[in-house]
Design a protein with these regions (language model features):
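N-terminal single-pass transmembrane signal-anchor helix
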Residues: 1-34
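Residue-level preference for alpha-helix termini and adjacent loops
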Residues: 6, 32, 41, 68, ...
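Short alpha-helical interface patches
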Residues: 19, 27, 35-40, 83-94
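Alpha-helical interaction segments
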Residues: 19-20, 50, 110-112
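Membrane-proximal N-terminal amphipathic helix
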Residues: 37-63
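Periplasmic/extracellular, small/polar-rich flexible segments of pilin-like filament-forming proteins
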Residues: 58-146
Length: 146
C-alpha cells in the first residue's frame, strides 16, 4: 500500500467550509467601519466644541470687550459663545460638519453622515455653562452615537 502524503478531498472541503463560516462571522464587523469613523469624528468635534467654549469663556473673563479667536469674532451669551458662532470658534470646517441653529441650540452633524448621529450645543443660561448633548437615533437611543 502507498503511504498517504497530502489531504483528502473531504478534508479540503471541510477547511473551506470552516473558513467560509469564519468569514461570514467577521464580515459584518469590517463592513461597519464607516459608522465607527463617523462616530469617532463626531467625538472629536464634540471635544473641540467643549474646549473652544471653555477657552472663549476664559478669554471673555480676561477681556470682556471683544474676543477674537483665530481671526473669528466671538459673540457671547452669558459669558460663553453663542450657538451661532460655536462651530466657527471650534474650528469645525463647513466641508466636514453641518451646523443648524434653532434659537439657542446648535445641532452639529457630520457632513454626508446620518442625521441620527449628532450632538447639540445649547447656549449657557445665567451663571451656568453651556450644555453639550448627544443626539442619537432621533433622540431615542444612545447606542447609535457615542
Amino acid at each position: 500500500m502507498k503511504k498517504q502524503s497530502g489531504f483528502t478531498l473531504i478534508e479540503l472541503v471541510m477547511v473551506i467550509v470552516i473558513l467560509g463560516i469564519l468569514a461570514a462571522t467577521a464580515l459584518p464587523k469590517f463592513a461597519d467601519l464607516s459608522s465607527d469613523a463617523e462616530k469617532a469624528s463626531l467625538q472629536g468635534a464634540r471635544g473641540s466644541v467643549s474646549s473652544a467654549s471653555s477657552i472663549a469663556h476664559a478669554a471673555y473673563l480676561v477681556d470682556s470687550t471683544t474676543v477674537s479667536i483665530e481671526g473669528t469674532a466671538v459673540a457671547f451669551a452669558n459669558k460663553y459663545p453663542t450657538a451661532a458662532t460655536i462651530a466657527a470658534v471650534a474650528g469645525l470646517a463647513a466641508t466636514d460638519f453641518t451646523t443648524s441653529v434653532t434659537g439657542t441650540v446648535a445641532t452639529i452633524t457630520k457632513t454626508g453622515g446620518t442625521a441620527d448621529c449628532a450632538f447639540t450645543y445649547t447656549e449657557a443660561a445665567a451663571n451656568a455653562a453651556p450644555t453639550i448633548s448627544v443626539v442619537a437615533d432621533g433622540g431615542t437611543s444612545a447606542a447609535v452615537c457615542p
